[in-house]
Amino acid sequence: MKKAQFDPDKAIVGASYPPPHNEPCRGRKTWPLTTVYGLTQFGVNRVELAPGSWSTQRHWHKTNDEVVVVVSGEIVLVTDDGEEVLGPGDCVAFRMNDPNAHHFQNRSDQLAVFYDIGGRDPYDVSTFPDAGFEAKPRFEIKFRPIKP
């Protein structure tokens, strides 16, 4: 297995949410580092958040666990339990099927970098309670209203 070269010019910029839910994420850049190797059991993303940007809309996963490790800068974790500031070396994990939705905001004036590590269950459904929609399984990537 050869090493993959990190190419700063090949970032995925922003989020694919329907407007206006994509707006807070415009300053997000993501590099799916494990995709180049064809890994199917877990994924690792390098994420850069510009000042004022969100990582995602607040969400939780039905069948995927998730871990975030902060490399540089400062991000604010926002959950149903409140807010917590995270900095370099801090780590937080989210269990699958726990409806305590989460996301990160960069409220500082500096770039923040973190790694997002999680499962890759193709049938996972992500629920976005604040935005009022859920994302179908990864292979379909469509958004639909949350069922009552």
Whereabouts are the PLM-identified features?
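Short, charged/polar surface micro-motifs in flexible loops or helix N-caps
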Residues: 50-54, 74, 83, 98-100, ...
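Active-site donor-binding loop signature of nucleotide-sugar glycosyltransferases
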Residues: 51, 88, 119, 130
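Short, conserved beta-strand element in jelly-roll/cupin
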Residues: 46-50, 60-78, 117-119
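Conserved short histidine dyad/triad with adjacent acidic residue
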Residues: 27-30, 45-61, 99
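Ligand-binding loop in jelly-roll beta-barrel domains
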Residues: 38, 96-123
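A short, N-terminal "cap"/entry segment at the start of jelly-roll beta-barrel domains
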Residues: 1-41, 125-148
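Short acidic-glycine-tyrosine-enriched beta hairpin
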Residues: 80-96
